[in-house]
């Protein structure tokens, strides 16, 4: 009888410990997603920004599109990865005085593309990190809007994954 009680007490302690661990891990995951450690969510074709992009670039095939306020003017901007014959490209549609302009294309990964909006330099605007791969070669680049152009701040292996 004593052994049964001891086993029951141990089982209760283990269950309480597992429940506590689950709660701690859940909070940690929520903190990570709140701290910018997650990739941006892709927009669908029905999104108004995607439709506006397509109206100005009807010959482009969007692979993925993402939105955030890149230039810190209070209006959402669009980052689109578009399919190219030889190479994919990233084109930004940036808001300016209630209108939008399109940046020149920059190379983009061929497969498994992801975008993260981050504020590396702690100024008002956001930098855009693009990652992806081609045939198992992983690469990434960090871009910043400067004077109406997407400036490549830093990257690694983008030539191998584009």
Model-predicted segments: where are they?
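Beta-propeller fold detector
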Residues: 102-106, 151-159
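Positively charged n-region of N-terminal signal peptides that target proteins for export
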Residues: 1-4
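An anionic, turn-rich surface loop/hairpin at beta-sheet edges
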Residues: 99-117
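Acidic/hydrophobic-patterned starts of short beta strands in beta-sheet-rich repeat architectures
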Residues: 72-81, 122-131
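Beta-propeller blade termini
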Residues: 59-70, 112-120, 125
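N-terminal, intrinsically disordered, polar/charged segments of Gram-positive cell-envelope systems
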Residues: 23-65
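Hydrophobic membrane-insertion alpha-helices, especially the h-region
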Residues: 6-20
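Structural motif
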Residues: 86-92, 136-142
